[in-house]
Amino acid sequence: LVENSSDLDFGRRFCNILEQVHRQTGKCCVVLVDEYDKPLLDVMDSGLRMKDGNGNEVLIEDHNRGILKGFYSAFKAADAHLRFVLLTGVTKFSQVSVFSGFNQPKDISMDDNYEAICGISKAELLENLMQPVGELAEIYDVDTDKMVELLEEQYDGYHFSSGMTDMFNPFSLLNAFDKRRLDSFWFSTGTPTYLIRLLQHNHENLNDLTGRYYRPADFVDYKADAENPLAMIYQSGYLTIKGFNRRFNTFLLDFPNKEVKEGFVSLVANNYLQVSRDTAVEAMEWVQTIEAGNLSLLRKQLTAFFASIPYTMRRKENERERERYFHYTFYLIFRLMSTYTILTEKRQSEGRADCIIETPAAVFIFEFKLDGTADEALRQIEEKGYARPYAADKRPVRKIGVVFSSQTGTIEEWKEA
């Protein structure tokens, strides 16, 4: 189609192809590009370098950006030969000029008109997929209504605009039907390398990201930056819209479903704590122990878990680092456990308990202290009235004070009242 193609850059070569196809067929072209930003994400903030055509050393990220800019500029030059162009990717890269040559692209990321363009809605599930739902229900020995509820809990919960239409992850949902089991299919496909690098920059800030309202500019229009992880985490599908405040035009962001929450928190915990065993598996065992009411076993399990964390991670040099490690470690542990049981955050006028876990048989109130005493922790539970909301509850309320040593990095004292 193109003569002397070796002498043309990518953009011009692509433009010539579009022109020739139009001329030979008499029809304008439709161009679909998936993961348009992958060449940038793969090397973003990696610091990797290469030699350019002139022998100069440049960042691979900058080199790839230049190639993409030239390639995508072809769409403007070939406008007369195009019927429709659709690009999908994780990021907009609005401030890195990849699309500076584009002819007014339309961003439909949060457009109500297109909020259901990806995924499977509950209405579509009920109308078209009840046969595989019924087959799964039979395997799990539940009725179809319960099976739909389980599928929603595991794979539903995505929202892409203020319209708040619930969407299932189609990859996970269809794999569940095909494999005839509920599992973490999307997360098992592998974690992008750019996300791993991002998490290494932002460990202690992740507990502040979820369950909060943000302006659209905070997570949609941004410059890809490892120091600002929110937008990348949201646009990668690990967070989604869970609420909309029309008055202030702000969006509540949180995990979409159980699959993503379990996978993401486990990824963060494994990456941060550097333990050899999967923390999600550990969390399942802890939940089973709590549900059995065996607190002595839970203490042994948690003590062993902390001991498995490399000493260099547990032993921080300054007080601020020790305090931050202590709080973030317990945050990760109980955030993982909340995937499998009820973890409540009931705030009193005097404050909020470190952790309250509800099971069908009992309520467990935990208070943690760094280099304090278990009696101090138990006294705080009483003085702050953390058990007050359960005064009329028929379940027994068990109060546990736990002391974490900054010197050893493990549990030093454990006492129940």
Show which residues each predicted segment covers.
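Structural motif
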Residues: 30, 362-364, 398
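Active-site metal-binding core of divalent-cation-utilizing nuclease and nuclease-like domains
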Residues: 20-25, 336-360
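Mg2+/Mn2+-dependent nuclease catalytic core
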Residues: 53-66, 370-387
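Metal-dependent nuclease catalytic cores in nucleic-acid-processing enzymes
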Residues: 70-78, 231-239, 328-336, 380-400
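Domain-level recognition of nuclease-like catalytic cores that cleave nucleotide substrates
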Residues: 389, 393-417
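Phosphate-binding site recognition
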Residues: 1-322, 337-338
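Conserved catalytic cores of phosphodiester-cleaving nucleases, focusing on short active-site segments
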Residues: 330, 353-370, 384
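Switch/connector loops and helix/strand junctions flanking conserved nucleotide-binding motifs
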Residues: 39-41, 94-100, 374-377, 407-413
